[in-house]
Amino acid sequence: MERFEITKTPINTENIIKKVEKREAGAITTFIGTVREWTNGKRTVRLEYEAYEPMAVQMLAQIGAEIEEKWEGASAAITHRIGVLDIGEAAVVIAVSSPHRKAAYEANEYAIERIKQIVPIWKKEIWEDGEQWIGDQLETTAYPNGKPDLSEGEQHD
């Protein structure tokens, strides 16, 4: 059972939780990032996610290792979906188990922030009146001409 995955199919939250269940855990926190209808005053129709999959999985595993190092006894599982997602669908599910609830909450928040910082996933927002590729999950880089072509040597930081 892989704890860190990129998938094209809907995410089963219960399966993600099972990946971190252990007898030592006193808490399991779950974060489910869903597609919202309104973003910055624009009505979203759907989102499209693409990823450089091998690197994305590697970075998700790195985040898991960072969590295990920072919070003793913690364990994480992360699945991010790619492809076309409709309003209300889960784009990312993060489950963290820990001996104590505070660490589980902190580690889960850490995971989503690190995903936005280092995982090579691109999001295309499709609105009622247009669309735009977002170049990073922090939403600080837009690609008005489309997502980067990694085959041409452009890299995601």
Curated annotation (Swiss-Prot):
InterPro entries: MoaE_sf (IPR036563), Mopterin_biosynth_MoaE (IPR003448)
GO-annotated cellular components: cytosol
Binding site for substrate: 34-36, 44, 100-101, 116, 123-125
UniProt keyword Transferase present: yes
This protein's UniProt keywords: Molybdenum cofactor biosynthesis, Transferase
Pfam families documented for this protein: MoaE
Annotated transmembrane regions: none
Known pathway: Cofactor biosynthesis; molybdopterin biosynthesis
Known catalytic reactions: 2 [molybdopterin-synthase sulfur-carrier protein]-C-terminal-Gly-aminoethanethioate + cyclic pyranopterin phosphate + H2O = molybdopterin + 2 [molybdopterin-synthase sulfur-carrier protein]-C-terminal Gly-Gly + 2 H(+)
EC number: 2.8.1.12
Top-rank lineage group of the source organism: Bacteria
Entry keyword ATP-binding: no
UniProt GO MF annotations: molybdopterin synthase activity
GO biological process: Mo-molybdopterin cofactor biosynthetic process
UniProt similarity note: Belongs to the MoaE family.
Known role: Converts molybdopterin precursor Z into molybdopterin. This requires the incorporation of two sulfur atoms into precursor Z to generate a dithiolene group. The sulfur is provided by MoaD.
Quaternary structure note: Heterotetramer of 2 MoaD subunits and 2 MoaE subunits. Also stable as homodimer. The enzyme changes between these two forms during catalysis.
Listed name of the protein: Molybdopterin synthase catalytic subunit
Organism of provenance: Bacillus subtilis (strain 168)
Source organism phylogeny: Bacteria, Bacillati, Bacillota, Bacilli, Bacillales
